[in-house]
Design a protein with these regions (language model features):
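Non-transmembrane, aqueous-exposed alpha-helical and coiled segments at domain scale
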Residues: 1-427
Length: 427
């Protein structure tokens, strides 16, 4: 059986045999279908690129029907249990699990680059009195590139690597700066002897001049959440990273663009929306009425459903377990029972089952963050810190891909036909 698709253009009666590779046909082959030589050629219309593969990638694999997520072939369940964020970041970048020597060298490099340039603090001082941390983080990533003018040499592998290390290493400090700026507090430098996640907690929570020692369970929980959020195929922010990067922009500009995409409430703000929903529902006895209102179209069950996953999000199962470990330390979030009852009903109710609405990674993560003392406006920042690793792995893959061209989609024009300008006096 040939791996081809035969199309007949009923406008002309001509048939075309299009090759199928990796369950896809090339848009360029569709473009060859035309009525006459002067015709532009056939286009595909795909708003939001729902069924369009814009690249080939070796980084993340998702099977939405089976609820599978893998980084570089490794199941997310194994990485969350056995690995660490910094090891996963290196895996995403290099494609293989590192040796102990390789991991130690990587950690040393991250350590050496973890403090942003001193003058970057002045940027935060120039912002509004209480800027949203995501807005401040976007500005910081964009400004960071001005301190490293070599960054525009994106075709130099050594230069690329230095910028990748700097961005991943400095993301926690920039995020902590943004949070402390909103609270009107001075910045706290990183401390020695703490993990990547632990140092972020120190820079965020410490009193100036004093060391903050994170609880090991909470430190590990945050690291696991960083692993779960490190990459997720071609989502909105990753596509923004690739799209801006395709113009040969430096990685700082591309990361700023990706962070801006993540700032959108339809992308990075989902766990915040879940928490607000749970606060709105309130007590356990109000769950049935809320479910009824959702089924009537009067509200939305936040944290359920996903563009890709049509079964249980594998990350959600891990987050649920992490939540139990965190609550054993912090005490149970009073909204946990409400969340569990919403999940129980939704997994049994035909309305949600038939629509394949299952819990996603955001359903329980907001409860964890709240229990750990993070303000709601930091939730998306906690998404952005680890996602820098995925963004940069995707960016470098794009830079090295010989098929890469500057992103330039087509449109279907629906505006006015040609018309003559009318002078103001004649309108």
């Amino acid at each position: 059986m040939a791996d081809t698709l035969t199309l007949t253009d009923n406008r002309t009666g001509r048939s075309y045999e299009l090759p199928i590779q990796d369950e896809a046909i090339r848009a360029a082959d569709i473009h060859k279908i035309r009525v006459n030589a002067s015709d532009f050629g056939l286009m595909t219309y795909d708003p939001a690129l729902v069924n369009t593969a814009a690249c080939r990638s070796r980084i993340s694999y998702i099977d939405g029907d089976a609820g599978i997520l893998r980084y570089r072939g490794y199941p997310i369940e194994q990485l969350a249990e056995k690995s660490s964020f910094l090891e996963v970041a290196l895996l995403l970048l290099d494609g293989e699990l590192p040796s102990q020597a390789g991991l130690d060298a990587w950690k040393a490099t991250i350590h050496d680059h973890r403090v942003p340039p001193a003058r970057i603090q002045a940027l935060f001082d120039g912002l509004a009195e209480d800027p949203h941390p995501m807005g401040a983080l976007i500005a910081a990533f964009g400004a960071l590139g001005t301190f490293y003018p070599e960054a525009h040499k994106i075709n130099d592998a050594d230069v690329r690597r230095r910028q990748i290390c700097r961005i991943i290493a400095q993301a926690p400090a920039l995020a902590a700066y943004a949070a402390r700026k909103r609270r009107g507090e001075p910045v706290v430098p990183p401390a020695e002897g703490l993990s990547f996640a632990g140092n972020f907690l120190h820079m965020l929570k410490a009193t100036p001049g004093q060391r903050y020692e994170p609880h090991p369970v909470l430190e590990r929980a945050l690291d696991v959440l960083f692993v779960l959020h490190a990459d997720h195929e071609q989502n909105c922010s990753t596509f923004a990273m690739r799209s801006v990067g395709s113009s040969n922009a430096d990685p700082y500009s591309s990361v700023a663009a990706a962070t801006a995409a993540l700032y959108g409430p339809l992308h990075g703000g989902a766990n915040e929306a879940v928490l607000r929903m749970l606060h709105t529902v309130g007590s356990l006895d109000k769950v049935p009425a809320f479910i009824s209102s959702v089924k009537k179209g009067e509200g939305r069950l936040m944290g359920f459903g996903h563009r890709i996953y049509k079964s249980y999000d594998p990350r959600a199962r891990i987050v649920k377990q992490v939540a139990e470990e965190v609550f054993a330390v912090t005490g149970v979030n009073p909204l946990l029972e409400t969340a569990q009852e919403l999940e129980r009903i939704a997994l049994q109710d035909e309305y949600f089952v038939n629509r394949k609405l299952y819990p996603n990674v955001d359903f329980y993560s907001g409860l964890i963050y709240e229990a750990m003392g993070f303000p709601v406006d930091m939730f998306t920042v906690l998404f952005a810190i680890p996602r820098t690793a995925g963004w940069l792995a995707q960016w470098e893959e794009m830079v090295c891909d010989p098929e890469t061209k500057i992103t330039r989609p087509r449109q279907i024009y629906t505006g006015a036909d040609v018309r003559d300008y009318v002078p103001m006096t004649a309108r």
